[in-house]
Amino acid sequence: MVFQERTYSVLIVTASDTFANSVMPLLPMTDYWPVTIVHSISEARRRVVDTEFDIVLINAPLPDDFGMRLAIDICTNSGAGVLLLV
């Protein structure tokens, strides 16, 4: 069996640049690329429609909603793994 390397696309949804900056070192570009950072639920919904992500990190609460409904919708409608951080 041949091992194939894979990179995972990541969407980070957070109102805080501090959170995004603290998570980025945990996501090396060799394994996680591209990493997209958005700052609102509405922007995240637009990105999810346009791009298929493997992993979605939601740092709740967000300015326009808590984030739970977004997490449920992404889990229901895509194959992405979702982590809701409160």
Region locations from a protein language model:
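Non-catalytic signal-transmission and effector/linker regions of two-component phosphorelay proteins
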Residues: M1-P25
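Flexible, charged surface loops at secondary-structure boundaries
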Residues: F3-T7, V49-E52, T76
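Structural motif
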Residues: I12-D17, H39, I58-L62, L85-V86
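Short alpha-helical
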Residues: T18, E43, D65
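Alpha-helical interaction/dimerization surfaces of two-component signaling modules
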Residues: P25-M29, R47
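A generic structural motif
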Residues: T30-V35
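Acidic, metal-coordinating helix/loop segments flanking the phosphotransfer/catalytic sites
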Residues: I37-I55
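Conserved phosphotransfer microenvironments
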Residues: D54-A80, V86
